[in-house]
Amino acid sequence: MAGSSSVQPQFIASTGNRSFSNAPLIENSDPEQIIVPDRKSWKNLFAYMGPGFLVSIAYIDPGNFETDLQSGAQYKYELLWIILVASCAALIIQSLAANLGVVTGKHLAEHCRNEYPRIPNFILWVLAEIAIVACDIPEVIGTAFALNMLFKIPVWIGVLLTGLSTLVLLALQQYGVRKLELFIAFLVCTIAGCFFAELGYAKPDAKEVLKGLFVPQLKGNGAAGLAISLLGAMVMPHNLFLHSALVLSRKIPRSMHGIKDACRFYMIESGFALVLAFLINVSIISVSGAVCNSPNINAQDQENCKDLDLNKASFLLENVLGSWSSKLFAIALLASGQSSTITGTYAGQYVMQGFLDLRLTPWLRNFLTRSLAIVPSLIVAIIGGSSGAGKLIIIASMILSFELPFALVPLLKFTSSKTKMGIYANSTTISSITWVIGFLIMAINIYYLASSFIKILLHGHLKLVAAIFLGIFGFLGMAVYLAGVAYLVLRRNKEATHLVALTSENPQIANESGNEGVYSLPREDIACMQLPQRRSNANDL
C-alpha cells in the first residue's frame, strides 16, 4: 500500500496514550491541490500566496470605509497612527491563526469543538454565527450604496440584489481555491487602484500625513471614541476562523524546516496583503481629510463632513473632486462589498463545519447568512433611508467588538499551548506580546461597549422606569459577558490532539508511526472549498 500513489497519507495524531487516524474528508478524490516543493527556496513563497488576500478583505470592508471617512473628515490625519498600530497588531494575530492551522492540521473552530464542553462550544458557535451576520450587514449596505451611486438603483432594491450578485460570484468555488484567491486579489488591487487615484488627485499634504502616522495624538472631543472604533474595526473575529482554515489548502512538507518555512512564508504573504490594506485605509483617511478641509468646499459639503457616511461621501467627492471620483469610489465600494461577502460565506462554512461537524453547499450557506443580514438591512433602508442604513453599520461594528474576545482568547491559548502546538507553541516572549495585544484590544472594545451603553442611559431621553430596567439588564449582561471571557481566559487546556510528526524533533517518528511520505495531507474540504459530508471511515476510532 505504501507504494501506491492512490493511497492518501494520513496524520498520526496523539491524545496522550491514544492515537488515531485523521483520515481525509473526501475519499479517492483528486482536488486541485497546491503542492509546496520540498526544497529550501524563496520561490516557495509563490505557492503560499493567496490566503492573506482573502483575509485582508476584512480590513477594507465597507464598515472600515465608513470609519475611515469619519476619521478623516473630523480629525484630518491625526488618527492615522491608529491604523498603523492596528495593522501591526493584526499581522501578529493573523499569523497566529495561520500557525495554528499549519502545525495542527485543524482550524480554530475544530479546536474549539475538541477543547470545550458541549454547552460552551454551542455558545461559541452561536456567537461566531452572530459575528458573521453582523459582518455581512455592512457588506449588504455598502453594496447597495454602490449600486445606487453607479446605476441610481434605490438602496432597498440594492439590498435585495446583493444576494443574487454574490451567488453569481460564488460560482467561482467550483474552480478551486486558487482561482478564488486570484479573483479576490484582483478585487483588492481594484480597490487599491481606485483609492490611490483619488489620493493622487486630492493631493493631501505629505508632511501632515507622515506626522499623523508616526506622532500619536488624540485631540478634540470624540477622538478617543473614534480611535476605538478604528481599532475595533481592524480585527474581525470571523477572520481568525477563516485564516486558520485557508492555510490547510496547501500540501506542505512534514519536516522541521517544512513547517517552519510554512509559518514564515504565511506571515510574509499575509504581510504583503495587510500592507496593501493598510495603504488603502491610509488613502481613504487622507482623501477624506483633504477633501473636508479643502478651501474650495461649500457650506453644504461642510455640513456633510460633520456626519460623513458612505452615501454622503459619494456626493462630497463628486462636488469637490469631480464626478469621476464618485464613480471610482462606487467601484471600490462594490468590489469591497462583494469580496467581503464571499470570504464571509466561507468563514461561515468553516465555523459551522468546525463547531458542529455540519457542512452546507456554499450557495445554501450564503442564502442563510445573507437572509439574516438582508432582513434588518432592508427594514432599516425602507424606514430610515440612507442615514438609517449608515447607522446600522455602526451597530454592526459594535456587535463585532463584543464578539472578538470569544475568538481571540481561544486562539491565544491554543497557540501558546504545548499540548496543541508541541515545539511550535509560542515562546514566552511571543506569548507575552500577543496576550498584551489581546488584552489591550479586548479592554478597548469592552470600554467602547460600556461607554456607549452608559451614553444611551444618560442621554437617550428614556423614561425613568425604562432607564432603570435597561440599566439592570444591561449591567447584568455585562457581568455575564465578563464572566464568559474570564472562563475562556482562566480555563486550563485539556490534553488535546496534535500531530506527532510536528511535535517531535525527529521526523523519523512520524514514519515509524505509519505516516507515508514527506508531505502532510492537505484538507481536501478546504482545497476544494466544498465542505462535503464526512464519510464513515473504518480507521477512525
Swiss-Prot record:
In the UniProt record, which residues carry a glycan?
Answer: 17, 426, 511
KW ATP-binding (keyword) present: no
Q: Which Gene Ontology BP terms does the record give?
A: iron ion transmembrane transport; manganese ion transport
Membrane-spanning ranges: 45-65, 78-98, 122-142, 153-173, 182-202, 222-242, 271-291, 315-335, 371-391, 392-412, 430-450, 465-485
Q: Which residues form a coiled coil?
A: none
Q: How does it sit in the membrane?
A: Multi-pass membrane protein
Keyword terms, alphabetized: Glycoprotein, Ion transport, Membrane, Transmembrane, Transmembrane helix, Transport
What GO MF annotations does this protein's record show?
A: cadmium ion transmembrane transporter activity; manganese ion transmembrane transporter activity
NADP among keywords: no
Per the UniProt record, one Pfam family is Nramp
- Kindly list the places in or outside the cell where this protein is found, as annotated in its UniProt entry: Membrane
- Per the record, the major location class is membrane
Record-linked InterPro entries: NRAMP_fam
- GO CC aspect terms: plasma membrane
Can you tell which superkingdom this protein's organism belongs to?
A: Eukaryota
Q: According to its UniProt record, which protein family does this protein belong to? A: Belongs to the NRAMP (TC 2.A.55) family.
Function text: Probable divalent metal transporter.
**What is this protein called in UniProt?**
Metal transporter Nramp1
Gene name of the encoded protein: NRAMP1
